[in-house]
Amino acid sequence: MTTLKKTLRWTRAAWAAGCAMLCSAGAMAQEVIPVELPDERNMIGAGAFAVPDFYGAEDYHAEGAGFLHVNLGNGLWLELLGQELRLNVVPGYVGQNFQQLSTVRAGFIYRGRPSRDTDVDDEVVQRMRRLPVASELGVFASYSLPMPGDHPMHKIVFSGDAAWSTNTAYTGAVGNIRATYFYPFPQGLGGKPLLGSAGFGLFFSSDHFNEHYFGIQGADLALYPELGGVPFRPEGGLTSIRIPVSLTSQLGPHWSLTVAGRYERLLNDAADSPLVRTRGNENQWTLGAAINYYF
């Protein structure tokens, strides 16, 4: 099979897998699984994660997530991370005068943001108005800063994205900025390569986004008598900080195991929402593991 045919085959598979995962967004409680791929090898994987019942919830449940990275040639790639699909459109090489592009990636992002419905443990939240699935389209960019040493995986990746709802679930933009440090341990488990990562990120959102997910108004006011009938309309801005960590152990030439987690602390009006203060928790966790196959 020619390289072109292989690329086309895996591209079709990537789109199919991406659509399947994104169409299931209504069941997912987190829009972004805390896994960041450290390199650009062709890969397919699957994992299970404990995620909050809804954004700001106290209770958790298990969900599955799929992963896929397909190289399209000359540094272009398509990547699926749970409910997030990314297409890098920056070529890896465009001539000797632009070698620095090998550390820069940018392109388009499509994300499914989950619904909030009656499938939660909290009895009050079960009776609140249902929030439909939101789909988001936007852009992303990242820069990889090599760290001292000869190992290409020893680096800091600075990244950011901005997206807008495509189905009028909310208005205004949401965005992330983050830095992730990757460290290849000199001695791994059983002599196998071991890669660790830790990051820090900020999540920003619009007024309408926070009002949509954290606001209390309309018929929901009767469920929160402490508000005295006064709607709670949170403002946007800095909504949370996010701290992801992961460990990836190579199991063989084609297999690896990743254990990952993320702590998220809701801030400002999001943390002050009665939905979070009385029915949930401002401390949000995502924990899980995934098995990956490189091809």
Regions found by a protein language model. Give the residues of each.
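Cleavable N-terminal export/targeting peptides
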Residues: 1-41
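Short loop/turn motifs that connect adjacent beta-strands in outer-membrane beta-barrel proteins
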Residues: 30-41, 75-103, 146-155, 169-171, ...
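Outer-membrane beta-barrel transmembrane domain signature
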Residues: 31, 145-149, 163-258, 264-271, ...
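Transmembrane beta-strands of outer-membrane beta-barrel proteins
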Residues: 40-46, 66, 78, 104-108, ...
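Transmembrane beta-strand segments that form the barrel wall of outer-membrane beta-barrel proteins
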Residues: 44-52, 76-86, 122-126, 154-166
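Solvent-exposed loop/turn segments connecting transmembrane beta-strands
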Residues: 53-62, 89, 131-134, 163-174
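Outer-membrane beta-barrel "beta-signal"
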Residues: 65-67, 281-295
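Transmembrane beta-barrel domains of outer membrane proteins
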Residues: 69-71, 86-90, 97-98, 140-146, ...
